[in-house]
């Protein structure tokens, strides 16, 4: 297996087409009912991996292109004698900009998450013991081994789950019936059990790396929708 500029372009093209097809097929109720949501999520995972690992496999045959591809390569890697810096090529410049922007976007996403959680933690209050016990019972039913903490906040209008290692379910400060509480708690525990917060983190990193491809944002939006449907 090896990575070349051609294999990179090919994997981007195939993955982008796949994202668009999955997006439109997912909207078809018959398709979802027949193949199921887990199949769609699995196909999105394959798209993830293919774009992130643009290898040329030994069992594949490379299609020869003597018109478009050579022109692109010649334009991106011109004769170095024409430049003051011998190591300069347009390809190196594009790669440098790509990496620099990716690092900035990933750091910004991590910072925004950390800042949001820090603000939320300042507004939380301890719940009544019976509510924590109720959440513990739901978490046990969902077969979650780790402790799931319950916190209450006035600064949110809908439930929020955060914490990669020690999950916390944050409820808005309002009165819920037992049925409403159990329904919301089950939904949030489903996210915890399925490691959805890790999937969303990987999606943010993925979008940070491939920020120049508008279709990854379509994937992010649709994947988030699928994760909600799964719970």
Segments predicted by a language model, with ranges:
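Membrane-embedded and juxtamembrane structural elements of multi-pass membrane proteins
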Residues: 2-68, 85-231
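Membrane-interfacial helical/loop segments at transmembrane boundaries in membrane proteins
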Residues: 65-83
